[in-house]
Regions:
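Structural/interface elements that position substrates and couple domains in central-metabolism enzymes
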Residues: 1-451
Length: 451
């Protein structure tokens, strides 16, 4: 007789939830799948669309990661892989992984999260492991989520300590190593008590396999803080290098060569390179979360001047690239192709993409803007009121590379127009391509002024 598999639910099937769902569906023990996995989405139009797409074998995420695509196709063939819009399906699940978006809103910051936990409290049983993966303002779980969650559980005569509530923030990276970022990235975790921490650790080890990849914190608030500090550190470094990008042109220096020389020192090997700007769902919002904690949860007056300035600089960072391009040519009535629309390489994720904002700004300056990106569908580009360019074409007045897709590194510049201006604003082209363009007077690299 076949042993009944333990049911695991993944709440949220977006850029974090979907690969998590696929990884869990593929965990095996003794050549047998370990879990019956249920993916649950919101019961609204967007959520229903995602569920219908999965049931009809239509991907909602296009990925350059072969492993992601392999696991996705495998999941479609399994009878014990389910998707749903109904939180009542949690009743039979002993493990729940929560991967939903969290954003600061004027009046309803915690509404979606609290509503979700209200429903979870109505449907779960004792001894259920809950792992919350969402990035949150430090103090959210203990001050906002858990008190209300505990009250709702008590209505069903379940004590909070009878549920294994834990927190382990995600470090998922869309792109060519999408699945690897889940199974190989170090994880931090904590829980409301010793047993919750232990249950969380044991489950994460099913995904990671290596204990050395795990760091346990004493409290959930420490774990929440770790994610915000991690992303704030990165955002500040990006803002810092923008100052040097601006001065490098006036000094007529090759900033990229300087940075690569500095990187050889072990203490400085993670210094950032000049680029178009901050994009994606995390770095554009996460640094502000500690300010929210200070003001709304702690009711304190901490100003966080460094983080505040970094956020301001990063929001305006594309202006550095715009000024750089404008300094080389007049943009009005020019036919421009931008290569790259996602926020990072080898993904179709356009959330808060600086490339899209850059294209919109060029359009407002009177340019006729086309966008070419092998990972993005035409309708997604046209929603931004930008022309879609399906294939790379050298017959433009200006070609601007903004995202370092691997496919762009294979381009040969044989038929480029004599007067075409070519820009690399984000370290997109490889050394071979740069060498082939070295003698072209109309080729410009952000941060490299005398290469």
């Amino acid at each position: 007789k076949t042993k009944k598999r333990e049911k695991v639910a993944v709440l949220g099937l977006g850029y974090v939830g979907m690969p998590t769902f696929l990884v869990l569906s593929n965990i095996k023990k003794n050549n047998s799948y370990s879990y019956h996995v249920i993916g649950i989405e919101k019961n609204d139009n967007e959520g229903k669309k995602k569920i219908n797409c999965f049931k009809n074998r239509i991907k909602t995420i296009d990925s350059s990661d072969n492993e992601f695509n392999k696991l996705y196709n495998n999941a479609l063939t399994r009878k014990d892989i389910e998707v749903s819009n109904n939180l009542k399906d949690l009743k039979e699940c002993k493990k729940i992984i929560i991967s939903i978006n969290f954003e600061i809103k004027k009046d309803k910051t915690y509404q979606n999260l609290q509503n979700l936990f209200d429903q979870i409290a109505k449907n779960i049983s004792k001894k259920t492991l809950i792992i919350l993966q969402s990035t949150l303002p430090p103090g959210t779980c203990h001050n906002i989520i858990l008190p209300r969650f505990e009250r709702n559980l008590l209505k069903r005569k379940i004590k909070l300590k009878e549920v294994y509530f834990s927190y382990s923030y995600e470090r998922v990276t869309p792109g060519s190593n999408y699945i690897k970022s889940i199974i190989s990235s170090p994880r931090c975790y904590s829980g409301i008590n010793k047993i919750s921490k232990k249950k969380c650790q044991n489950f994460l080890l099913k995904i990671l396999k290596k204990r050395k990849l795990l760091t346990e914190f004493k409290t959930i608030t420490e774990c929440e803080t770790a994610k915000i500090l991690e992303n704030s550190y990165r955002a500040i470094n990006i803002a810092f290098i923008d100052e040097w990008t601006k001065i490098s042109e006036k000094l007529n220096i090759d900033l990229l060569s300087i940075i690569n020389g500095i990187k050889k020192r072990a203490t400085h090997n993670n210094i950032m390179l000049p680029g178009l700007g901050v994009g994606g769902y995390c770095l554009t919002k996460d640094p502000s979360f500690i300010k929210y904690t200070s003001k709304k949860i702690l009711k304190s007056q901490n100003k966080f001047p460094i983080i505040s300035q970094a956020i301001k600089v990063n929001k305006q960072m594309i202006l550095t690239s715009l000024k750089f391009v404008k300094s080389k040519t007049n943009l009005r009535n020019k036919k421009i192709m931008i290569c790259g629309g996602s926020y990072k390489e080898d993904t179709n994720d356009m959330r808060y993409s600086p490339s899209i904002e850059f294209a919109i700004r060029l359009k407002k300056m009177g340019a006729k803007v086309f966008l070419h990106d092998p990972w993005i569908k035409e309708k997604e580009i046209e929603l931004k009121k930008i022309f879609f360019q399906e294939k790379f074409n050298e017959k433009f007045d200006i070609i601007i590379f903004t995202v370092g897709h691997k496919l762009f590194k294979k381009i040969k510049f044989h038929k480029i127009k004599k007067n075409c201006l070519l820009f690399d604003l984000n370290n997109c082209l490889n050394q071979s391509q740069i060498s082939s363009l070295k003698n072209k007077k109309n080729f410009f690299i952000l941060g490299r002024n005398n290469y």
